[in-house]
């Protein structure tokens, strides 16, 4: 009890009412524009859609200052006095400003937490989403059961705002945030539909992801707390999640609710070989023991979502499967544990024995069908995987067209170089190569064969297959056997911070 009271007091001492004035500072919106402009896009760098104008920001801040624009009129609900006439453009600017402002205190708290845990030097590698796969390679081969869980969306955005209020005590800021979401997301309805949430997430991705991540961290904090109290393997790096208001009361209520199913103490959860991995809205729970314990955690998740977040979830939506008989999808890969059986002859004196040895190996496979579906959606091929031209790029120069296709191939190869088998990756690169050739032929109003014969582009287009080997040769010795072995083995790059549309994780 005392240790968590100390946590709460320390959290309260850091909470200050300073977020509201920042929303009226011009440099906040300039910072939001700069971060969006410099963000590297996975498919191609298209830049920022909306032009940044200091005059527009000044006009918007003036509107927000005026009291008559902050009054909600119930009799005239069709008009939008808060955002004015340019609703979509102003809402985009305001949402990015909200996202920048609200991230500031949590970034400072995260930095201090990392310094206390003495992992600040390796934080850049820990940020990589590919750092999950080396962990899975080490752990999954020793486990037997896995549960593939899709985290449900909250039924109302007010739940997300309430979760954020546990961390920051700034009433004016939250009034302004609610006012903005009220006009933009139509909070008149009791339940926010999945379609409206999807629209909000696409038009305001940064603010939505920030609110949604806090919703996920709220339930994860209780899960990690129970996990740490039931295991001798403490997760000190997640201590930042535990500093929140009413956390101890939630924990006591949770134990009381599950006393009937989980016994009267938390010692029932003792399992040193249960592992939890999450990315975005999908999490993987794996264990070595019998599925009885996995069922307990399954019901814990369901009751937690229903009791604390008013999110309805059915038990049948969470399945528990044997790893040797089930494959699951994570971060654009298909993962399954394959059993390798081998027979060893053993001789003892005059007797000879045949011993069967079973070993496990984690297969990480490139999903060819979802990738072809993504390429077809981007108009690089049809639904059967046959390459087609990209006429919208025909106005660019030959060098720019080839550079665009090379960038996509380079990023795909960079992302999927950890796969067990490279055949699917080579098929995708082959589709992009032919699509590039057809696009160039379409630009020059010629057939593919005539264009290649006339321009002699074979050597230039060989970069689709040779560039990766040249990069590896700069890192490793120029030995053909070494490069051949590297092409067969998995290589994880710890500089990949996010996935994109071509990496379909549905």
UniProtKB/Swiss-Prot annotation:
GO terms for biological process: mRNA processing; RNA splicing; tRNA processing. The keyword Manganese does not apply. Belongs to the intron maturase 2 family. MatK subfamily. Keywords: Chloroplast, mRNA processing, Plastid, RNA-binding, tRNA processing. This is Maturase K. Usually encoded in the trnK tRNA gene intron. Probably assists in splicing its own and other chloroplast group II introns. One of its GO terms (molecular function) is RNA binding. It is found in: Plastid, Chloroplast. InterPro entries: Domain_X (IPR024937), Maturase_MatK (IPR002866), Maturase_MatK_N (IPR024942). Its main location: plastid. It comes from Melilotus albus. It comes from the Eukaryota. One of its GO terms (cellular component) is chloroplast.
């Amino acid at each position: 009890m005392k240790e968590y009271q100390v946590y709460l007091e320390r959290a309260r001492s850091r909470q200050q009412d300073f977020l509201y004035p920042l929303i009226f500072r011009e440099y906040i919106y300039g910072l939001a524009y700069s971060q969006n402009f410099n963000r590297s896009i996975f498919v191609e760098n298209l830049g920022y859609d909306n032009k940044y104008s200091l005059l527009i920001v000044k006009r918007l801040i003036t509107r927000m200052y005026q009291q008559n624009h902050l009054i909600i009129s119930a009799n005239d609900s069709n008009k939008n006095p808060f955002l004015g006439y340019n609703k979509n453009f102003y809402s985009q600017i305001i949402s990015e400003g909200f996202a920048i402002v609200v991230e500031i205190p949590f970034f400072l708290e995260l930095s201090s937490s990392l310094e206390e845990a003495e992992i600040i030097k390796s934080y850049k590698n820990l940020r990589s989403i590919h750092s999950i796969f080396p962990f899975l390679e080490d752990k999954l081969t020793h486990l037997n059961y896995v549960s593939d869980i899709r985290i449900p969306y909250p039924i109302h955005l007010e739940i997300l705002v309430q979760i954020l209020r546990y961390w920051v005590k700034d009433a004016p800021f939250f009034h302004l945030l609610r006012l903005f979401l009220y006009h933009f997301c139509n909070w008149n309805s009791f339940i926010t539909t999945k379609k409206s949430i999807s629209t909000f997430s696409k038009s305001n991705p940064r603010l939505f992801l920030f609110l949604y991540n806090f919703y996920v961290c709220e339930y994860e904090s209780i899960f990690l707390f129970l996990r740490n109290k039931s295991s001798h393997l403490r997760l000190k790096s997640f201590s930042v999640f535990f500093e929140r208001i009413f956390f101890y009361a939630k924990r006591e209520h949770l134990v009381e609710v599950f006393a009937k199913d989980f016994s009267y103490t938390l010692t029932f959860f003792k399992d040193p070989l249960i592992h939890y991995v999450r990315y975005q809205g999908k999490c993987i729970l794996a264990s070595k023991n019998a599925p009885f314990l996995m069922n307990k955690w399954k019901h814990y998740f369901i009751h937690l979502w229903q009791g604390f977040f008013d999110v309805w979830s059915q038990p049948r939506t969470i399945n528990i499967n044997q790893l040797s008989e089930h494959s699951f999808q994570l971060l654009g890969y298909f993962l399954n544990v394959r059993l390798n059986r081998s027979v060893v002859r053993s001789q003892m004196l005059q007797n000879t024995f045949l011993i069967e040895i079973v070993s496990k190996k984690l297969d990480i496979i490139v999903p060819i069908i979802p990738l072809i579906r993504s390429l077809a959606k981007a108009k690089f091929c049809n639904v059967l995987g046959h390459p087609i031209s990209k006429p919208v790029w025909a106005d660019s120069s030959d060098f720019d067209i080839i550079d665009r296709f090379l960038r996509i191939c380079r990023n795909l190869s960079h992302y999927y170089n950890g796969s067990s088998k490279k055949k699917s990756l080579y098929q995708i690169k082959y589709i992009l190569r032919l699509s590039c050739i057809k696009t160039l032929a379409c630009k020059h109003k010629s057939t593919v064969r005539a264009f290649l014969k006339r321009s002699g582009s074979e050597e230039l287009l060989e970069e689709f297959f040779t560039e990766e080997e040249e990069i590896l040769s700069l890192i490793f010795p120029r030995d053909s056997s070494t490069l051949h072995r590297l092409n067969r083995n998995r290589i994880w790059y710890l500089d990949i911070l996010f996935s994109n549309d071509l990496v379909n994780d549905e």
